[in-house]
Each structure stands twice: as C-alpha cells, then as structure tokens.
Amino acid sequence: MEKRPYSVAWLSESSQRKPLCTNVDLLGYKSGNPDLPPNREYNVSLPSRVILPTPDYREKENYCGRNVHNGERSPPVRDQLHFHPAPQELTTSRRTSIEVSAESSTDQRVIGMTDTNKKTISVCDEDAASRARTKFTAEQLEELEKSFKENRYIGSSEKRRLSKVLKLSENQIKTWFQNRRMKFKRQTQDARVEAFFSGLYLPYYGYPDLPTPGYSVQSEFPVLAPQTMAASSIPFGPLHSTVMSPGLHPAIPSANLGSYPCSSMLVRPILNEPTRQRYSPY
C-alpha cells in the first residue's frame, strides 16, 4: 500500500469510496498481521482513527419504492414488534364493551331508583306518623287551659290526672303544654312591644303570676288625661311644664309595682330627668 499525502480531496474521495471488504479485522491490521489479503483498499482516513463503513441506504430506498409501486407498504418496526388488531375488530370490540357497560349502567340505575323509592316511601311514612296531630275537643281544651292558668309547667301528678280525666296520653299533654308556653311567650312579647310604643306598659291579663290592678287606669294615672296632654302639645315649651310634679302624682302601692314584669317602663321614671329648657332654633 503506497503512501499518499493527506489532503481534503483525498479525504473526500476516500469517504465516498465504497469499501470492498466490510468484515475486516482492523485490530489485526493495526498490529501488522501478515494474514490479511493483499491489494485490498481500506477506508482509513487517519492512522489514529478508523472510519467505519457507512450503510448504504439506496437498497432500502429501492425496496420501499418497489413496495409503493406494487401497492404494498412495509410495516414500521413498532407495528412489527406489537400486534395491532384491524379497525373492524376494534369497532366490534368497542361496540360490545359499550353495550355491556350500558346494560350494567341501566341495571344500576334501576336498582338505585328502586332503593330511592323505598327510602322516600319509608321517610314519608315516618313523617306521616310523626306529624299526626291530635284534635282536642272543647272540653279537653277548657280543662287544659284551666291547668295552664294554675301552672305553666305541669308536674307528673297533674299530667297523670289529666291523662285519666281527658283520656289522653302523657306525651300529648306534655306537647300541648310546650306549644302553649311558646304561644304565651309570643303574646307577652307582642304586648310589651305594643305597650312600649303606646307609652305605658300594660301587663298580660288573665294569669295569677301577672295580677291585674283593681283600680281604673284613667282615674289612677291622670298623666294621660286630656288636660295634661293638651299642655304637652306646645312644641317649644319648657319640659317641667309638660310633666307633673312628683307631689301631684298618685302613690302606687309597692306590691302592685312588684307584680309588673317590667315596672321601669311606667311613666313615673320620666320624672327623674333634670328639668332644662329645650333648645329653640328660631
């Protein structure tokens, strides 16, 4: 093998040159093995580096062109490795899976609907049983009202007596007393609000814990008389002219004051305010 000077042209020719022997023991060539066949050309660019033969893609291109020309197409490598079913098989399998899932979902829906219907029916039955209202007669209501006036919180002995007399269960009597207490509370609150806006607190009549005074309201409270109210109609008069002096106000017994739920809302505490002139802007 003759030695040539290394140049760019020689390197390009050597890279484009087709190797004659691809299966060559390059290690033996480097070590100077004399068994190598003579007159062979090797694709060697540099002594320290060996350029391996580049694969020839022309045969592959010709093979693909023949397949395309004949109407065939070579399958890719991943298709060769993994088997993929045909589209028709996919569609049929998908249809069967969809049908099976639809049937199972319909069955589950039917079962769920039946369960919900059973639950709703049971809940309705329980509500109907719990919401059963007791219709009291006039005699029963009269006896219950009489017992409520005596004591708003019924005891066990009174409950047993009423259940025997009125032929009612103790739970029915207990429920009636609870509802009656709530009604009494609402009536008392409404009366307080109405009395607050009217200027005089009037207690709730008809029960022993709120005794009513035995005297007339107009005679004992002359503050509400028309003569005194006419004097208070002056818009910018002094305050002491509209309020009566404490000596003219009638003395109310202390026992009656204690019977009121809120005695501070009476007209009398207004007299404790200091007397001063009202401011007149004009």
Swiss-Prot record:
GO CC, any one term: nucleus
InterPro entries registered for this protein in UniProt: HD, Homeobox_CS, Homeobox_TF, Homeodomain-like_sf
Transcription regulation keyword on record: yes
UniProtKB keywords: Developmental protein, DNA-binding, Homeobox, Nucleus, Transcription, Transcription regulation
An example Gene Ontology molecular-function term: DNA binding
Location of the DNA-binding region in this protein: 129-188
SMART domains listed in its UniProt record: HOX (SM00389)
Keyword Signal listed: no
GO biological processes: BMP signaling pathway; determination of ventral identity; negative regulation of DNA-templated transcription; negative regulation of transcription by RNA polymerase II
Superkingdom field: Eukaryota
Localization terms from the record: Nucleus
Function according to Swiss-Prot or TrEMBL: Transcriptional repressor. Acts in a ventral signaling pathway downstream of bmp4 to antagonize the Spemann organizer and ventrally pattern the embryonic mesoderm. Represses transcription of the dorsal genes gsc and otx2.
Protein name per its UniProtKB record: Homeobox protein vex1
The species this protein was found in: Xenopus tropicalis (Western clawed frog)
Gene label: vex1
